[in-house]
């Protein structure tokens, strides 16, 4: 039972890391990256549909994204969804594909995005601490109902803290890498 608590915490930490990676992927760093468009949903026949299900997204050049719809009739809807999103890129529709030219980031924009990255990283750490608290509470509950001994509880708490520290270190590393990527000129 004790190992199950640690394994469950590890699993939830991994989900937090994946969520953070997706979040960082959607923060543009001056380079074209298909994940910039991951959050965009297109009204397609009245149903909100993720853009990546309606079109192939390629990166032909370092700062250009090419959106090629599978159904050409959805071109206008895709263009409208990109315009309505908060990514700050204007689509250029040439009748069969949509070109997105990623503008160079100004120093001020880079610093703002770096602040945003720090904030997102801090939120991920809060999520990690909440997962740790849940695991600790579960361990104490197990000790209270005599499923584990007091010594096993102390050992379990150390294990939980160890995996928590590793998860926080991983988040710090991910945050530092994204900040470095943003501040590169």
Curated annotation (Swiss-Prot):
InterPro entries hit by this protein: Ribosome_recyc_fac, Ribosome_recyc_fac_dom, RRF_sf
Entry keyword NADP: no
Pfam families reported for this sequence: RRF
Keyword presence, Protein biosynthesis: yes
Highest taxon of source: Bacteria
GO molecular function: ribosomal large subunit binding
One GO cellular component term noted in the UniProt record for this chain: cytoplasm
Keywords, comma-separated and alphabetical: Cytoplasm, Protein biosynthesis
Subcellular location: Cytoplasm
UniProt record, GO biological process: translational termination
Family: Belongs to the RRF family.
Purpose: Responsible for the release of ribosomes from messenger RNA at the termination of protein biosynthesis. May increase the efficiency of translation by recycling ribosomes from one round of translation to another.
PANTHER family given in the database record: MITOCHONDRIAL RIBOSOME RECYCLING FACTOR PSEUDO 1 (PTHR20982:SF3), RIBOSOME RECYCLING FACTOR (PTHR20982)
HAMAP family: RRF
Protein name: Ribosome-recycling factor
Source species of the chain: Streptococcus mutans serotype c (strain ATCC 700610 / UA159)
Gene it is expressed from: frr
């Amino acid at each position: 039972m004790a190992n199950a608590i640690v394994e469950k915490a590890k699993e939830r930490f991994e989900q937090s890391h994946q969520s953070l990676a997706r979040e960082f992927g959607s923060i543009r760093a001056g380079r074209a990256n298909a994940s910039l468009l991951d959050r965009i949903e297109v009204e397609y026949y009245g149903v909100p549909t993720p853009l990546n299900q309606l079109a192939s997204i390629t990166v032909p050049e370092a700062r250009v994204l090419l959106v090629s719809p599978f159904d050409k009739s959805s071109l206008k809807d895709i263009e409208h969804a990109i315009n309505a999103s908060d990514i700050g890129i204007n689509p250029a529709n040439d009748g069969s594909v949509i070109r997105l030219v990623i503008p160079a980031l100004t120093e001020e924009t880079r610093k703002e995005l770096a602040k945003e990255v720090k904030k997102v990283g801090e939120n991920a750490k809060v999520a990690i601490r909440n997962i740790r608290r849940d695991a600790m509470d579960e361990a104490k509950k197990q000790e209270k109902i005599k499923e584990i001994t007091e010594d096993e509880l102390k050992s379990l708490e150390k294990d939980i803290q160890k995996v928590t520290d590793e998860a926080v270190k991983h988040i710090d590393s991910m945050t530092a890498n994204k900040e470095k990527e943003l501040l590169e000129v």
